[in-house]
Amino acid sequence: MTDQHSFETLAIHAGNTADPLTGAVVPPIYQVSTYKQDGVGGLRGGYEYSRSANPTRTALEENLAALEGGRRGLAFASGLAAEDCLLRTLLTPGDHVVIPDDAYGGTFRLFAKVASRWGVEFSVADTSDVAAVRAAITPRTKAVWVETPSNPLLGITDIAAVADVARQAGARLVVDNTFASPYLQQPLALGADVVVHSTTKYMGGHSDVVGGALVVNDKGLAEELAFHQNAMGAVAGPFDAWLVLRGIKTLAVRMDRHTENAGRIAELLTRHPAVTQVLYPGLPDHPGHEIAAKQMRAFGGMVSFRVRGGEQAAVDVCNRAELFTLGESLGGVESLLEHPGRMTHASAAGSPLEVPADLVRLSVGIENGDDLLADLAQALG
């Protein structure tokens, strides 16, 4: 398998070599903690203990690297475990990070409640504004953190432009690519140093696994991250790794359907009198539309909107939905909706990252589009 193959082919075959003993075309689940050695130090394939390495996890990590066009992929027990490993690898007490002013609530909590306790400082900036990012950088800035599209406001950051700003400051650019997936966007090719994923979401794609990933190109950074991954221990288990690998095989076809349905829903919302604003980068009037069109293959399956009537009206929409399941997370084959202010982003309440109280976030699934439109129309009233 080479990088000359198309994304769809890599998704199915990269890291997925046939089992040498049986010829099984799907990598086995190596549900094992330790490995027999051929004499002291005589490791087979470098495997000694599954926290350090496991063949099923290796297959996933090779696949992740291929899909993002990176040198090394690392799989973790959750997206936040991946982020924590990255912070501990890149930063020391007194260092500074620029994060988005609309970051995922869990990421904000990690910086505000955990990293800050061991001396890491951060400031927030509108990362869709390159000048604002530049202004937020200090002499102690070691990383610029970007989500694009962002969660839950669907903001778009020009990855290449911010990469230049970070590079000039001697800082690394970290891009959370969860909302886009590597099928729609490949940040390393645009100048990012690190790509972060919650593989729970589109990569797994079936709402049955929790996982995270980091992908990098720099060999030295890859080795440092691998050291911390092993030292900290929050690795993906073999069954979880296998589930993500299984999900990735259909990532391309799923993302095409997610995007198709999301585009139709965004158009419906723009015409509905109960909606005051639609946040979807595929709409021509979205402020990041042109940049998204430049750096993404398509616009993805996430849509947020604001409801006329305020917070209670937004909550009522969530409660009236039937086909859209009220729940947190995103990226599965089934459609979900939530009230971010009371659910996924409750930890940002009272902070500069607090989300609008009238906001509803949709994770648009791959069901029949007409069925989804009908359910949303009745939920809006």
Where do the PLM segments sit?
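N-terminal glycine-rich, Lys/His-bearing helix-loop that initiates the first secondary-structure elements
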Residues: 1-47
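Conserved PLP-enzyme active-site core in the AAT-like
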Residues: 2, 13, 72-274, 279
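Conserved N-terminal alpha-helix of the aminotransferase class I/II PLP-enzyme fold
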Residues: 34-84, 106-113
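A common structural junction motif
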Residues: 232-233, 320-329, 379-381
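Positively charged, small/polar-rich N-terminal and surface patches that mediate targeting and assembly
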Residues: 2-4, 8, 55, 277, ...
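PLP-dependent enzyme catalytic core of the Aspartate aminotransferase-like
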Residues: 112, 121-123, 139-142, 319, ...
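Conserved small-domain helix->loop->beta segment predominantly found in fold-type I
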Residues: 263-322, 326-328, 347-354
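Short, well-ordered beta-strand elements within core beta-sheets of diverse protein domains
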Residues: 244-253, 300-308, 361-365
